[in-house]
């Protein structure tokens, strides 16, 4: 397939000269116009150029080695996808966040110095809840759904966190608490549990001899 989305320029990264900036050959999404410069790649294998895929590298972000950014995902500032990282489903990376090794994020948002490593995963839930990960968080396990992680939180390999509820679970420096969704403290009309229909009373005189 011909890459009509972007070209790799001769502008080398000041610290990693084997990486080069990209330049848009057409508009990409709402924020990228034809001719705009983007972040750095090692090859076309790092950033999708599928038709209608608005995945993009902004600012000084990097996608290198065999890392792949696709499905409308965007990297900003100095974020980095390296090694065999896989960034998909509208994920967003900013700050100095990193996805590395064999890790993946799907529908997640990373900020600050957040790091997904090893075989770690940050995934959106079936209901569309996106985990947000910031601060100096390190994830080696799985985080899926309505979570916000910050501070020095560490998710160990083998640890699996799932939350598909409206209430957001916050993990910060070893403390876990709940951020209740709006409306949880009020009563709503028409919401009740189903009650089984009452059985008819039996005729206790049936069969009795007087």
Task: Show the residue positions of the predicted features.
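Surface-exposed loop/turn motifs in large extracellular/passenger domains
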Residues: 49-58, 71, 106, 122-124, ...
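Terminal amphipathic alpha-helical/low-complexity segments used for targeting or macromolecular assembly
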Residues: 1-54, 60, 78, 84, ...
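Low-complexity, polar/charged sequence tracts that form flexible coils or short amphipathic helices
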Residues: 67-68, 85, 108, 125, ...
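Extracellular beta-rich repeat passengers
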Residues: 111, 116, 122-139, 143-167
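Short, well-ordered helical secondary-structure segments
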Residues: 9-12, 28, 97, 103, ...
